[in-house]
């Protein structure tokens, strides 16, 4: 084994080391975000282990029936939510939490309060668990001005105010993608070390992609610009090859592929869901933040996604995100439609 390769293999950039490096670039940093992120990472490791069916044997019991004496198995999404809420509260760095699983925001006990708000979906795509499709955790972090008098209003900030965002995908491997506002980096969980190692430094999405990702089962309810765009993907007028369709139906997996390979992911509004289906605070915003940090863009059909100001915590929005030029094309179609309506 040559020495150079060996040196490279033994110099591990863990997520903790990466975040500490980022912190040291900012002279007024107190380490609060670093501590908060390490608690999120712990939550992700726990969920990764649970999703991988750790402890399954105890649950099923030797005879193959479900263990009757033991507690009934908690649904994974409920379990994941509890783990994240407890990890975030105990970090002492949060004052309010918004989870997809909880109808109301959670205000942290004053003694444990810190200056951050975390919005998260503990297990996105959890309806896919049984068929082995990748699922994930999504999170976005905001700063709160006055932690002692925090209100719901403080949570309803536009996405551009986020200080960090990321997702963790539990698939064939466990991958955590993170941005603290200075580019996007991907880390993979090394199960033998229990550490996330930097495997995808400085992710940049291709300027234009060959893939479109959308649930075409909703096509009959789409608006005009969406229908036109998908038509162009399939039957390009300019002689170029048609785009490939890839749709997993788990947002984390679809966005992850879009980020790495380029292309566009869309969940448009339709007649049944006039505001689309994805939630602003913990799906649309974090993914849009990552896309922009990676050189792509994100659009709601009306505006840049990160400029949207939500009015309630579980608000929904249509979303088009991905490669810069592909989203630019969608923006053009919406602009043309608006002009048409204006003239009528």
Swiss-Prot record:
Binding site for Mg(2+) 3: 121, 124, 283
Required cofactor(s): Mg(2+)
First-tier enzyme category under EC: hydrolase
Domain of life, per lineage: Eukaryota
GO biological processes: fructose 1,6-bisphosphate metabolic process; fructose 6-phosphate metabolic process; fructose metabolic process; gluconeogenesis; sucrose biosynthetic process
Residues annotated to bind Mg(2+) 1: 71, 100
GO molecular-function terms, A-Z: fructose 1,6-bisphosphate 1-phosphatase activity; metal ion binding
Keyword Hydrolase in annotation: yes
InterPro entries for the chain: FBPase_C_dom, FBPase_class-1, FBPase_N, FBPtase, Fructose_bisphosphatase_AS
HAMAP family hit by this protein: FBPase_class1
The protein's name in its UniProt record: Fructose-1,6-bisphosphatase, cytosolic
Species: Oryza coarctata (Wild rice)
């Amino acid at each position: 084994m040559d020495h150079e390769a060996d040196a490279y293999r033994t110099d591990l950039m863990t997520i903790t080391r990466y975040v500490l490096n980022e912190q040291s670039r900012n002279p007024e940093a107190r380490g609060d975000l670093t501590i908060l992120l390490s608690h999120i990472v712990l939550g992700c490791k726990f969920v990764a282990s649970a999703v991988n069916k750790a402890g399954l044997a105890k649950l099923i019991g030797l005879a193959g029936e479900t263990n009757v004496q033991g507690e009934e198995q908690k649904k994974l999404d409920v379990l994941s939510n509890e783990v994240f809420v407890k990890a975030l509260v105990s970090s002492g760095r949060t004052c309010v939490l918004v989870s997809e699983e909880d109808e109301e925001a959670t205000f942290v006990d004053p003694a444990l309060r810190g200056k951050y708000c975390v919005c998260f979906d503990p297990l996105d795509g959890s309806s896919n668990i049984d068929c082995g499709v990748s699922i994930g955790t999504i999170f976005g972090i905001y700063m709160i001005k006055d932690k002692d008098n925090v209100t719901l209003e403080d949570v309803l900030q536009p996405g551009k105010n986020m200080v960090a965002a990321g997702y963790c995908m539990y698939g064939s491997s466990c991958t955590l993608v993170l941005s603290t506002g200075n580019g996007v980096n991907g880390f993979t969980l090394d199960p033998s070390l229990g550490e996330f190692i930097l495997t995808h430094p400085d992710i940049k999405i291709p300027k234009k992609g060959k893939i479109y990702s959308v649930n075409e089962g909703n096509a009959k309810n789409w608006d005009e610009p969406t229908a036109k765009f998908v038509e162009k993907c399939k039957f390009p007028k300019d002689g170029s090859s048609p785009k490939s369709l890839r749709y997993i139906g788990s947002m984390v997996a679809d966005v992850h592929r879009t980020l790495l390979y380029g292309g566009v992911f869309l969940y448009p509004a339709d007649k049944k869901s006039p505001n689309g289906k994805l939630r602003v605070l913990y799906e649309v915003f974090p993914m849009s933040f990552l896309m922009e940090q990676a050189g792509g863009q994100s659009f709601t059909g009306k505006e840049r996604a990160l400029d949207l100001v939500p009015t309630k915590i579980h608000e929904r929005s249509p979303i088009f995100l991905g490669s810069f030029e592909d989203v630019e094309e969608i923006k053009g179609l919406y602009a043309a439609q608006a002009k048409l309506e204006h003239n009528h």
